[in-house]
Design a protein with these regions (language model features):
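Glycine/charged-rich beta-loop-alpha catalytic/anionic-binding loops adjacent to active sites
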Residues: 37-39, 73-76, 95-108, 144-149, ...
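Acidic-glycine-rich active-site phosphate/pyrophosphate-binding loop
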Residues: 24-33, 84-98, 135-144, 204-209, ...
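Claisen-condensing/thiolase-fold acyl-transfer catalytic domains that form or cleave C-C bonds
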Residues: 50, 54-57, 81-82, 100, ...
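Flexible, glycine-rich active-site loops centered on histidine and acidic residues
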Residues: 126-161
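Conserved beta-ketoacyl condensing-enzyme motif
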Residues: 3, 46-110, 115, 242-263
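Buried hydrophobic positions in well-ordered alpha/beta secondary-structure cores of metabolic enzymes
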Residues: 3-5, 31, 60, 74, ...
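Acidic, glycine-rich active-site loops and adjacent beta-strand->loop/helix elements
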Residues: 8-9, 77-82, 109-112, 137-142, ...
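Condensing-enzyme catalytic core mediating Claisen C-C bond formation in acyl metabolism
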Residues: 1-45, 151-223, 234, 327-334
């Protein structure tokens, strides 16, 4: 299976580090250096998650020079917080794109959803004869950030955008050599919007709590301090082993946005140099779309060339971890 082409949509509006610092009452240098945010895209009036997914998908189809009629499946990784509640988006993406013959599904692993979608797509190609699968998502969880809540400081980077990947059975493109996944159920309830579900239905009184919250900040910090970086390294190593490589063979690491020290810790753990990755300090965190954005930027900056070995690594609250090993074969990807 190959990643044949990619698409990214980013809103024009930006929130700078200065505004984040002002809202959160933090020193500017803490936002820039510790949190690793110089600026991030924020949504305009028309930038709804499913719409942004459509715009990114259109770019991916153009990049591969393929029409929507060629798609066998549409896998939507549009974020759970989206245009409408209790709404599946794969049919909408197919309708908007004109993929009338495609089958579809929605998939949600929070910020690890792209890796889950690659796993499902690989299975569809192996067992269902699929030849072309579109994975597309949109994200604007920045709406759910309460900058007055210091316990959610690690979420201040949440941004907005759309991303898509066109997967094909044949190349050229980034061949998916291996996938690896891990899950830590100890953090199952750690991060969530506490109102608006069946346990605490939305009401006028509950509106002020319609933000992402951390249930037990001290317990979550202790757990992540002990497990986060080691688990990132383990899942990447598992993917490398499945592909028959070691970290010494890697040319590029596409890593989701995280605080600057954590990004460096993952690179150091793999023995990689800083120039072998792109730190998304001008984009913030686009959730499950970070690896797509990183691959697009790496191609533009010449960090991925023919034969390059690439690792993707992600994590999503819940907690999910995932990694993939890719190799560019048969020409550049769009």
């Amino acid at each position: 299976m190959f990643i044949r082409s990619l698409g990214i949509y980013l809103p024009k509006e930006r929130m700078g580090a200065e505004e984040i610092a002002h809202r959160a009452k933090l020193p500017l240098e803490v936002v820039k250096e510790k949190l690793g945010i110089l600026e991030k895209p924020i949504p305009g009036p028309a930038d709804h998650p499913a719409e942004m997914a459509v715009w990114a998908a259109e770019e991916a189809l153009r990049g591969a020079n393929l029409g929507p009629e060629t798609l066998d499946w549409v896998i939507s990784i549009v974020e759970e917080y989206k245009d409408y509640p209790v709404w599946a988006t794969a049919p909408y993406l197919a309708q908007r794109l004109g993929a009338k013959g495609a089958l579809g599904m929605d998939l949600n692993q929070k910020c690890a959803s792209f890796l889950g979608a690659l796993e499902v797509a690989r299975g569809l190609m192996a067992t269902r004869g699929a030849k072309a699968i579109l994975v597309a998502g949109g994200y604007r969880n920045g709406d759910l950030v309460d900058y007055q809540d210091p316990h959610t400081r690690f979420l201040y980077d949440l941004a907005a955008g759309g991303g898509a990947a066109l997967l094909t059975r044949e190349g050229p493109g980034l061949r998916v050599l291996s996938l690896a996944h891990r899950m830590d159920p100890e953090l199952a309830l750690a991060v969530k919007v506490p109102v608006g579900g069946t346990r605490t239905p939305l009401s006028p009184e509950a509106l002020s709590e319609f933000y992402l919250r951390v249930e037990d900040p001290q317990a979550m910090k202790a757990r992540l301090d002990a497990t986060s970086i080691p688990t990132f390294l383990k899942v990447i190593q598992e993917a490398l082993e499945e592909a028959g490589y070691t970290s010494e063979d890697l040319d590029y690491l596409a890593l989701l946005h995280m605080k600057r020290s954590a990004h460096r810790a993952v690179l150091e753990g793999l023995g990689l140099r800083e120039e072998q990755s792109i730190y998304l300090e001008r984009f913030g965190h686009l959730g499950q779309l970070d690896p797509i954005l990183s691959l697009v930027l790496a191609r533009r900056e010449g960090k991925i060339r023919e034969g390059s070995l690439v690792a993707l690594a992600v994590a999503g609250v819940g907690y999910f971890y995932g990694a993939a090993i890719l190799r560019l074969e048969g020409g550049v990807y769009a």
